[in-house]
Structure formats: C-alpha cells, structure tokens
Amino acid sequence: MSKQGATIGENIKKYRNKLGISQDVLSKRANLAFHTIAKIEAGATPNPTIETVKKIAAALGVSLDDLIQK
C-alpha cells in the first residue's frame, strides 16, 4: 500500500468488498476479463485505462472520483 494513500486497486477492492461481491462477479458486471480486475487489485496493473476504471466504477455504483482518490 502506498504511504501517500490508497491506490485505484485498493479502492476497487474496498468498494467491491462493501458490496459483498467477488472479483468474478465484478468482472461480469463491468464486462471485463476476470484477470483484469485481479491484476488491478493486486497492483500488477497500477495505471489501468480510464475506460476500464469507468466500467468498474459503473459496476460498483460509485463515481470515478471515488476510485481514483487517495
């Protein structure tokens, strides 16, 4: 975890867990591959495209700002 604040992946995981859904369910809701969600949450893809983040935000029912804030 960054000392500066939460990463996009950490924020995605936080909101996903609040909803009580798995990475698989989120990937289907966002129409993305499972490994895309897994890699972002794990930090292996620290800078996903804005389109990917928009899809995830919509699937989680949160704003883009909620996911990119630190």
Where are these regions (language model features)?
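A short, Lys/Arg-rich alpha-helix, primarily the initiator
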Residues: M1-K18
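Short, Lys/Arg-enriched C-terminal cap helix and immediately downstream tail that follows
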Residues: Y15, T49-I50
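Alpha-helical residues within the helix-turn-helix
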Residues: N17, K28, A58
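Short alpha-helical DNA-recognition segment
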Residues: I21-I40
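Alpha-helical DNA-recognition elements
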Residues: K39, G43, K55
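DNA major-groove recognition helix of helix-turn-helix/homeodomain DNA-binding modules
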Residues: E51-D66
